[in-house]
């Protein structure tokens, strides 16, 4: 057997190492060029890839790896290694990017995209348009080498912060406050709400507001919409939630025939965006053109969402097409990098409060970050909208819609309306099953919550890579602490009791589903099924 020695560089999420490995070269001796796929077969057979990943130090880090090696690269002398494919990432993708120099063709991105998210392989190739992608970012959580990441907007945000003419306002999503600490060595799920606000103020943001506020606003609009459909438009039942942009795009691709079931409500991020440049700008006497709106999200798809053409309600309202509702999105991971760039030790910061006008949030809004949380929050307020009474205790701790099960079902009796049947779904493979039941007229529900990522936003594609691949222990710790925030003593637990949201209606929107609310807080969708047409 012919043997040779190769000097090989192996990349991980943060480091690069080099080493000299003995490999069997017989199959390659007669070739002038070796394909990337064949090269990784060669390296895998010698144990180079697996050994190299471990040698980078991931196994000794609290975050960012734990030394995870895809099965086919474990050990050595396992020729021939089965080198797998990978998902395509277009250069125009607004959410995701790949560093080819780090890709080891392990196939984990393809695995999660196909088997968990049910996107890859659900269309015939070749297609005529860009590669279908719902931008969920789950591939970035499964990639063992850090080759797949979010497309960073840190530089744009830093530039805005350095511009004295700009007023930079930032909103933070509920799920980020139970994950950010993991990037600083804290236990998974640690609540760092006040520290996160303090860090953002230290960095130099002019105002820090809470996406929980607009989650409460979303509940006011969406629960009102459900009541309207139950009473007047039953042909649009069941109503689908629409706050997850990955799910929405999935529905546009693969469910265009049932898209009328989607709620017209924007996500909390996209509701808060136009309000910062209209309502907030007027209250603070700031020119809307000078406001830069940034959001901190657990989700890579939010980068795509803020760039959707229709997300310019503030620009339409103000007659200036250059004004976008949300200018930049940073993931939880990007925020951690920004904090470290500014040499801030998150663990030592004193808690700071959110700023007023758009800063109040209820416990109902906070549980948006967990699968089932949107449904629980919505039904609490739906009950109040119909009865004008607060919901019973059981709806404040609605166990039937909690937990990590991919599909959950529940029902609630609402006086004058009767039994309302609901379902909660996370993971797009599960969504595909639910969609088939809608088509087959076998779905008994009036209201369905959909989240693209298994477990909901707590396990979004922009969250810390605390374990590779993601595991339910970490999802559970993050989820439990969101529910702790909801049940904390003194916390309002009903979205309709958010005083700042009520002030918004009194001063600006009038009431849920009003003409002004429809302009700023509601949207429309695009049939993307034709984008899956086979290229001819």
Q: How would you describe each model-predicted region?
A:
Residues 59-64, 71, 75, 80-89, ...:
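Iron-sulfur cluster-binding cysteine motifs and their immediate structural context
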Residues 44, 88-93, 98-100, 129-130, ...:
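Short, intrinsically disordered, charge-biased short linear motifs at domain edges
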Residues 1-35:
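N-terminal secretory signal peptides
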Residues 26, 31-95, 168-169, 201, ...:
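Non-ligating segments of multi-cofactor redox enzymes
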Residues 51-54, 117, 121, 307, ...:
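Short amphipathic alpha-helical interaction/hinge segments
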Residues 36, 40-46, 59-64, 140, ...:
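Iron-sulfur-associated redox domains of electron-transfer enzymes in respiratory
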């Amino acid at each position: 057997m012919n043997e040779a020695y190769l000097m090989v560089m192996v990349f991980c999420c943060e480091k690069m190492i080099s080493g000299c490995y003995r490999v069997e070269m017989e199959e390659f001796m007669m070739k002038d060029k070796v394909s990337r796929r064949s090269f990784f077969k060669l390296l895998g057979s010698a144990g180079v890839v697996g050994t190299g990943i471990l040698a980078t130090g991931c196994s000794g880090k609290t975050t960012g790896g734990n030394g995870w090696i895809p099965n086919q690269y474990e050990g050595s002398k396992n020729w021939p290694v089965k080198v797998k494919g990978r998902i395509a990432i277009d250069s125009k993708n607004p959410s995701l990017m790949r560093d080819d120099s780090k890709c080891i063709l392990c196939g984990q991105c393809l695995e999660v995209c196909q088997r968990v998210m049910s996107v890859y392989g659900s269309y015939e190739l070749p297609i005529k348009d860009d590669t279908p992608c719902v931008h969920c970012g789950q591939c970035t959580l499964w990639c063992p080498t850090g080759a797949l990441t979010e497309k960073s907007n840190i530089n744009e945000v830093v530039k805005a912060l350095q511009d004295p003419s700009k007023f930079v306002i930032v909103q933070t999503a509920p799920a980020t406050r139970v994950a950010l600490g993991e990037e600083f060595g804290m236990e998974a799920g640690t609540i760092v709400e006040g520290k996160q606000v303090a860090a953002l103020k230290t960095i130099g943001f002019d105002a820090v507001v809470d996406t929980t506020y607009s989650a409460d606003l979303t509940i006011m609009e969406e629960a009102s919409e459900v009541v309207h459909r139950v009473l007047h438009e039953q042909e649009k039942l069941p109503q689908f939630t629409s706050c997850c942009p990955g799910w929405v795009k999935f529905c546009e691709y693969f469910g265009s025939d049932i898209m009328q079931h989607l709620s017209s409500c924007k996500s909390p991020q996209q509701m808060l965006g136009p309000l910062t440049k209209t309502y907030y700008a007027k209250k603070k006497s700031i020119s809307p053109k000078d406001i830069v709106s940034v959001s901190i999200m657990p989700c890579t798809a939010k980068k795509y969402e803020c760039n959707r053409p229709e997300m310019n309600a503030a620009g339409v309202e103000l007659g200036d097409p250059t004004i976008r509702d949300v200018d930049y999105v940073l993931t939880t991971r990007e925020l951690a990098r920004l904090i470290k760039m500014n040499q801030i030790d998150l663990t030592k910061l004193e808690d700071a409060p959110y700023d007023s006008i758009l800063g109040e949030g209820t416990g109902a809004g906070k549980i948006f970050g967990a699968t089932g949380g949107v449904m629980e929050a919505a039904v609490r307020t739906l009950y109040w909208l119909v009865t004008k009474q607060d919901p019973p205790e059981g709806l404040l701790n609605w166990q039937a819609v909690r937990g990590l099960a991919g599909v959950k079902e529940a029902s609630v009796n609402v006086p004058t309306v009767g039994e309302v049947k609901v379902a909660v779904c996370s993971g797009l493979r599960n969504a595909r099953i639910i969609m088939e039941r809608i088509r087959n007229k076998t779905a008994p529900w009036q209201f369905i919550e959909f989240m693209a990522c298994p477990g909901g936003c707590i396990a979004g594609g922009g969250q810390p890579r605390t374990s590779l691949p993601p595991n339910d222990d970490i999802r559970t710790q993050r989820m439990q602490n969101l529910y702790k925030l909801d049940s904390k003593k003194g916390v309002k637990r009903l979205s309709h009791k958010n005083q700042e949201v009520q002030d918004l209606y009194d001063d600006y929107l009038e009431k849920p589903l009003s003409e002004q609310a429809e302009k700023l807080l509601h949207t429309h969708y695009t049939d993307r099924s034709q984008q899956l047409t086979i290229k001819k």
